[in-house]
């Protein structure tokens, strides 16, 4: 496994723990009949660390970018088939007359 993948998994685990801690904290506040204003500072720090780890993993895990060669056979455009029996040009745009007001 790649290091970026492991860091990403660890970041997701930290984010899920922060979500669980926030839900648990809100439940505790409901029991104590207090109002929820914001999550505790340790949950906010977990969110920031987890987000940073996930972003770092997302940028490093895919690998290096490959160059695109213009003469490569894989870069050819997809052309329409020569058999035009399956092409249908019957659509709502035909109802509107074309406006040809060309001024040069």
Swiss-Prot record:
It is a multi-pass membrane protein. One of its GO terms (cellular component) is endoplasmic reticulum. Residues 1-2, 62-104 are cytoplasmic. The chain crosses the membrane at residues 3-23, 41-61. It is found in: Endoplasmic reticulum membrane; Golgi apparatus membrane; Early endosome membrane. The keyword Membrane applies. It comes from the Eukaryota. InterPro entries: MMgT. Pfam families: MMgT. Keywords: Endoplasmic reticulum, Endosome, Golgi apparatus, Membrane, Transmembrane, Transmembrane helix. The keyword Transmembrane helix applies. Belongs to the membrane magnesium transporter (TC 1.A.67) family. Component of the ER membrane protein complex (EMC). Mediates Mg(2+) transport. PANTHER family: ER MEMBRANE PROTEIN COMPLEX SUBUNIT 5 (PTHR21181:SF7), PTHR21181. This is Membrane magnesium transporter.
């Amino acid at each position: 496994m790649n290091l970026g993948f492991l860091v990403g998994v660890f970041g997701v685990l930290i984010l899920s723990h922060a979500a669980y801690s926030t839900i648990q904290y809100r439940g505790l506040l409901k029991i104590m009949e207090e109002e929820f204003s914001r999550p505790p500072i340790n949950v906010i720090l977990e969110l920031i660390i987890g987000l940073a780890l996930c972003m770092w993993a997302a940028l490093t895990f895919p690998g290096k970018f490959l160059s695109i060669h213009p003469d490569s056979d894989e870069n050819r455009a997809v052309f329409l088939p020569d058999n035009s029996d399956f092409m249908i040009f019957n659509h709502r745009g035909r109802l509107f007359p074309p406006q040809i007001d060309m001024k040069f």
